[in-house]
Design a protein with these regions (language model features):
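Conserved donor-binding/catalytic core segment of Leloir-type glycosyltransferases
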Residues: 186-207, 213-217, 229
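Donor nucleotide-sugar binding/catalytic pocket of nucleotide-sugar-dependent glycosyltransferases
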Residues: 57-58, 138-185
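A short, well-ordered alpha-helix in the C-terminal region of glycosyltransferases
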Residues: 334, 341-357, 363-369
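Nucleotide-activated donor-binding/catalytic signature segment of Leloir-type glycosyltransferases, i.e.
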Residues: 232, 241-262
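Acidic donor-binding loop of glycosyltransferase active sites
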Residues: 255, 270-284, 297
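Conserved acidic donor-binding segment of nucleotide-sugar-dependent glycosyltransferases
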Residues: 312-314, 318-325, 334-340
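Short hydrophobic beta-strand element within catalytic cores of glycosyltransferases
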Residues: 298-301, 311
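Glycosyltransferase donor-sugar binding loop
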Residues: 40-44, 200, 227-242
């Protein structure tokens, strides 16, 4: 590759993802002398990236869409961007971002570093769509110069199935967490028996929304003063999306408070006593749990791929069984019965874990090293 700075495209299916999860990496690469181009959809966040000094090219990804002609058009659109911008290296994220960048770059002098940030429902379910996802990964991952994984389960799965050679892979601590932006803050002054639980997620059944609501229903009988909040967007385009009418019924019944969606999660974390994500979605490493722990909030999540990596059980948080509302309710009850000092100790352990294992700077350093090695390659 060139001895000068590289022309690097950072690609995902939404500019929202790039702005919220990869902005600091893009800034670091730019500071290293590389020309960084953001490639994603949804123009509002693309404009924010432009305002921060990054080149931005919008490509229309279709979310959960699977119409062949629409998907082919996206690949061709992405290929034009790679060619017109004379891209040396693509850093790709999200399933469609990974696969489509690989297809778009065929025949071009463009290397690719993939980031497998969880496999989601399409990879683990049965049916034609799942088989297609497996086929596309099999055909594209092997061509990548390097593949980062966010958890060891996914890394071993790809290696064992022969999708990628072990020597071209490594594991990252998720997307990491900005420890300065998510600084430790004291828990609210609430006594044992009361508390605010917060679930942060897209409202998909696979994220454990049903289990969370059923746990709230059970807990309100004994602890009527406890509050159960949900923060995140509805996703009508997803097969497993929670219908708006169902959510409105839960709110009307007083089971949960719906907080909508936000670009700034920090004030909601600061108002919560515990953050809950009972997901069985096949996560990478959920960013919401990292941010919660960084702000010293105890965490409850599932003993499932990706989620379990964020918690030291009984120390920084609690693990429950996937798809088990009763077990989730029992873990939430444990938090309700804790003294303020016990909750603070658990939250403090979570912060320490983030500092030791999930600092975003370690993720950025891993990318910087990989880019430097690829730059020196013939």
């Amino acid at each position: 590759m060139s001895t000068a700075g590289l022309r690097i495209a950072v690609a995902a299916n939404t500019s929202w993802y790039l702005y919220n999860f990869r902005r600091n990496l893009m800034r670091a690469l730019s500071d290293d002398g590389h020309h960084v181009v953001a490639v994603g959809g949804d123009g509002a966040f693309g404009q924010r990236l432009t305002e921060q000094g990054f080149a931005n090219r919008e490509v229309t990804f279709s979310g959960a869409g699977t119409r062949p002609w629409r998907e082919l058009a996206t690949v061709l659109e992405l290929r034009r961007v790679l060619r017109d911008e004379r891209i040396d290296l693509v850093l790709s994220y999200t399933p469609k971002g990974n696969v489509y960048a690989a297809l778009a770059g065929r025949g071009l002098p463009t290397a690719q570093v993939m980031n497998v940030s969880g496999l989601g429902r399409a990879f683990t379910s049965l049916g034609v769509a799942s088989r297609l996802v497996h086929l596309l990964y099999r055909q594209t991952v092997a061509r990548a110069a390097w593949v980062f994984f966010q958890n060891e389960d996914d890394r071993r799965l790809f290696i064992d199935r022969g999708y990628v050679q072990v020597g071209r892979t490594s594991r990252l601590p998720g997307s990491g967490v900005d420890l300065d932006a998510f600084a430790p803050t004291p828990l609210p002054s609430r006594q044992a028996g009361s508390g605010v639980f917060l679930m942060v997620a897209r409202l998909l059944w696979d994220k454990g929304v049903r289990e969370y609501v059923e746990a709230a229903r059970a807990l309100r009988v004994r602890w009527p003063q406890a509050r159960f909040q949900v923060l995140g967007p509805l996703d009508a385009s997803a097969r497993s999306g929670v219908p708006r009418a169902t959510l409105e019924a839960w709110v009307a019944d007083g089971l949960v408070e719906y907080l909508g969606e936000t670009d700034n999660i920090r004030p909601f974390l600061q108002a919560a006593d515990c953050v809950v994500l009972p997901s069985y979605y096949r996560e990478g490493v959920p960013r919401s749990l990292l941010e919660a722990a960084a702000t010293m909030r105890p965490v409850i999540t599932t003993d499932a791929v990706g989620c379990r990596d964020t918690v030291d059980p009984g120390i920084s948080g609690l693990l429950c069984r996937p798809r088990d509302a009763k077990d989730l309710a029992e873990k939430m009850a444990q938090v309700l019965m804790m003294t303020p000092e016990q909750r603070a100790a658990m939250g403090g352990a979570g912060r320490q874990k983030m500092e030791q294992e999930f600092d975003e700077r370690s993720v950025i350093d891993a990318y910087r090293l990989r880019v430097a090695l690829l730059k020196r390659a013939p």
